[in-house]
Regions:
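Active-site core of bacterial EAL-family cyclic-dinucleotide phosphodiesterase domains
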Residues: 99-157, 195, 256, 313, ...
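Cyclic-dinucleotide signaling modules
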Residues: 1-101, 105
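C-di-GMP signaling machinery
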Residues: 56-59, 73-119, 158-162, 198-207, ...
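Surface-exposed amphipathic alpha-helices with a cationic face
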Residues: 30, 179-183, 214-215, 241-249, ...
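Residue-level recognition of strand-loop junctions within catalytic nucleotide-signaling folds
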Residues: 12-17, 34, 55-56, 142, ...
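EAL-family c-di-GMP phosphodiesterase catalytic domain
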Residues: 144-145, 197-204, 223-238, 250-360
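Short catalytic/binding micro-motifs of nucleotide second-messenger systems
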Residues: 31-43, 178-184, 214, 355-357
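Catalytic core of bacterial c-di-GMP phosphodiesterases, primarily the EAL and HD-GYP domains
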Residues: 58, 128-136, 163-239, 315, ...
C-alpha cells in the first residue's frame, strides 16, 4: 500500500523478508530521483529520505497512527546521521526525542533561575616553566531534581531554539564577575577565553553589549578572549572576518577553536586577524606518527608564529605529547595532563599548584 500523507510526505506499507533488500530498493529509487533532470527546461534538485518502522513481532503491531509516528520520528533523525538517507526506528530514538523535549521545555526557566555555572580549564605556557596564564570558560547545567545535563546535549538545543544568545551573555557576564572578584582579592591577572556562538555574533549590538558588560566590571583590556570554532568561521566567513577586524579596537582578543577540522583553514588564515590558534588533538594524538605527520604539526605552529598568533594545543593527555609540542614551539597546552575543567570554587586551589606566570 502506497499513499501520500501530506505535502511531500509519502507512506509505504509492505511485507518484506529481507530488510537489506528493502533498503537496497529504497536507495535505488533515491538514486533515480537524484538524477532527475527536470521538466519543461526547468531543473530540479530532488532528494528522498526515509524513516522505517519494522514490524518483526506481534507486539510491534500498533495502530496506523502510532506506526506512522514512529516512522516519522526515524525520518526526522536522518538529518543527524551524516551521509545517510534512511534510519530505522528504535526505542532509543524515542527516548532521545523525549529527553530533548524535556530539555527544551525548561530552557527559559533554567536561564531565569540561573541554573548554570562556570567551570574553568587551565591553559599552561609550556615555553615558560609550565606557568598557568589563563583558562577556557565552560558552561555546566545542573538541573534541580535531575542532576548534570551534558553540554553535548543542551548546547545544540539552545542553538536550535535561539536561547544560546542569552546563555552566551550569561556566561560572559559571569566570567567578567569572576575576574573582578579576583582583582578585588589581589589575585594575579588571569586571561579567560569565552566561547561565543554564531547567533550571538550575528546580533547587531553584539560588540556594544559585550563591551558594556566588560566595562561594568572594570576588566582590563586583553584579559578576555572571544573564542569561536573553525567550522563556524568557515560557514560564516564574512561575518567573522568583520568581527575579528573589530575586536582589537574594542580591547578583546580572539581565538579559533578546533583548527584543522575544516577544509579551508590555511586559505582562511590569510584573511582574518587572530590572536590564538587552538590546535585540534587529531594533529598530535600520535606523537610516534610518521615524519610527515610531525612535519605538518610543526609547520602549522611555525605558520601561526609567522602570522603573529600564539598556539594552544587542546586535549593533551600524555607527557610525550607535551614534550613533542614543546619541542616544535607550541605556545601553550590545555588538557587533562595538567587539569580537567574545574568549578570556579576549586579553580584557585588548582591554580596555586602552578608556577606564577610573568608576562613576557
Amino acid at each position: 500500500t502506497f499513499g501520500r500523507i501530506s505535502g511531500d510526505n509519502f507512506a509505504l506499507l509492505r511485507c518484506y523478508r529481507d530488510i537489506d533488500d528493502l533498503v537496497a530498493r529504497f536507495l535505488r529509487c533515491s538514486d533515480l530521483l537524484t538524477r532527475f533532470e527536470g521538466l519543461a527546461n526547468r531543473r530540479f534538485r530532488v532528494e528522498m529520505i526515509a524513516g522505517i518502522y519494522l514490524v518483526e513481532r506481534p507486539e510491534d503491531i500498533l495502530s496506523i497512527d502510532d506506526m506512522l509516528d514512529r516512522a516519522n520520528l526515524a525520518q526526522k533523525s536522518v538529518k543527524h546521521l551524516s551521509g545517510s538517507k534512511y534510519a530505522l526506528y528504535s526505542e532509543e530514538m524515542r527516548k532521545r526525542v523525549l529527553y530533548e523535549k524535556n530539555i527544551e521545555s525548561c530552557m527559559e526557566e533554567a536561564l531565569r533561575n540561573r541554573e548554570f555555572c562556570l567551570h574553568l580549564q587551565p591553559q599552561v605556557d609550556i615555553q615558560h616553566g609550565d606557568a598557568l596564564f589563563g583558562a577556557e570558560v565552560l558552561v555546566r547545567w545542573e538541573r534541580p531534581g535531575y542532576g548534570m545535563v551534558s553540554p553535548g546535549d543542551f548546547i545544540p538545543l539552545f542553538e536550535r531554539n535561539g536561547f544560546i544568545v542569552d546563555l552566551d551573555a550569561f556566561v560572559f557576564e559571569e566570567a567578567c564577575a569572576y575576574l573582578a572578584s579576583r582583582g578585588s582579592r589581589g589575585l594575579p591577572p588571569l586571561r579567560l577565553s569565552v566561547n561565543v556562538s554564531r547567533l550571538s555574533i550575528a546580533q547587531g549590538d553584539f560588540l556594544d553589549r559585550y563591551s558594556a558588560i566588560r566595562d561594568k566590571y572594570g576588566i582590563d583590556s586583553g584579559m578576555l578572549e572571544l573564542e569561536c570554532t573553525e567550522t563556524m568561521v568557515i560557514r560564516n566567513f564574512a561575518l567573522f572576518r568583520e568581527l575579528m577586524a573589530a575586536l582589537p579596537s574594542r580591547g578583546f582578543r580572539s581565538a579559533m577553536d578546533d583548527f584543522g577540522t575544516g577544509y579551508s583553514s590555511l586559505n582562511m588564515l590569510k584573511e582574518i586577524a587572530l590572536d590564538v590558534l587552538k590546535l585540534d588533538i587529531a594533529f598530535f594524538r600520535d606523537t610516534e606518527g610518521t615524519p610527515r605527520e610531525r612535519a605538518v604539526v610543526e609547520s602549522i605552529v611555525q605558520m601561526a608564529r609567522a602570522l603573529g598568533m600564539s598556539t594552544v594545543a587542546e586535549g593533551v593527555e600524555k607527557q610525550e605529547q607535551v614534550e613533542f609540542l614543546r619541542s616544535i614551539g607550541c605556545s601553550a597546552i590545555q588538557g587533562f595532563i595538567f587539569s580537567r575543567p574545574v568549578p570556579l570554587a576549586l579553580f584557585e586551589s588548582v591554580e596555586a599548584s602552578f608556577p606564577l606566570y610573568v608576562e613576557g
